[in-house]
Amino acid sequence: MRTSRSALALPLALVAVLGLSACSGDTAPEETTSASTSVETPETEETPAEDTESEEEAEPAASGDKPAWAATNEVVGTQLGTAEGDGFTVDIYQVSTAVATKTGQFADESGKPILNPGDPIVFVNYVLTNTGDADLPLTYSIVGVDARYADWPYMQGMDSIVDSALFEAAGVVDSPITPGSGEAPFILAPGQSVAYGENFKHQPGSPIEFEVTLTPADAAGDLNHDLRQEVALSATIA
């Protein structure tokens, strides 16, 4: 677990309640499109697809195929490294950079948003693969990844921009589960993979740590805390 930080980032909705008018704005996910959407994509490491009998299974994947409930398992970006646990791996990729189209979701103690329109952001992609010999039952959270720069001053995790157009342009999804896929547990069979991504402030050349938490599901689809695993990867954002 991380130690406490010197500053506190507050949700913008809470800041508004406290009367800090400078932080009103986007606190809930919404679909937006923007003519100013701009994505710069670094060289991508592609994994050749294996010969299969269906187009869906022919997508590039980290390992094996994609379960029916997964939105994607596509490998996008340049690999930063792999966080390896007992029976699973999470490959982490830096995908592309863009410009924030709106205010972020958090503010500092003075009421100033942490992310503002025009700020540079970077997209990363997480690919979870079952490397074990048995099915891996998962909850709705699938796998949690907490990314933080070494000099991140807040106790909360890093802020992000909720904009579906930016995610689409980057070629990543913000949710690993296809809508309407049913109830947990979601089974990840041996060799299967699932992917999702996120964005945060772009600080090129900055050391960053990715803390990965995987808590399998029990038969009812609830978190099985007795089997919780935490692993980490240290890298540098380009």
Q: Model segments located where?
A:
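Surface-exposed edge beta-strand/loop patches
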Residues: G25, S181-A238
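Asparagine-centered strand-capping/turn motif at beta-strand->loop junctions
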Residues: V127-G132
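Extracytoplasmic low-complexity, Pro/Thr/Ser/Ala/Gly-rich segments
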Residues: T33-P117
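Short, solvent-exposed loop/turn segments enriched in Ser/Thr/Gly
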Residues: P120-V124, A195
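Bacterial N-terminal signal peptides that target proteins for export
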Residues: M1-P11
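The feature marks short-to-medium sequence segments in extracytoplasmic or secretory-pathway proteins
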Residues: D135-L188, A235
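Bacterial Sec signal peptide processing site at the extreme N-terminus
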Residues: D26-T32
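C-terminal motif of bacterial Sec signal peptides marking the signal peptidase cleavage site
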Residues: L18-A22
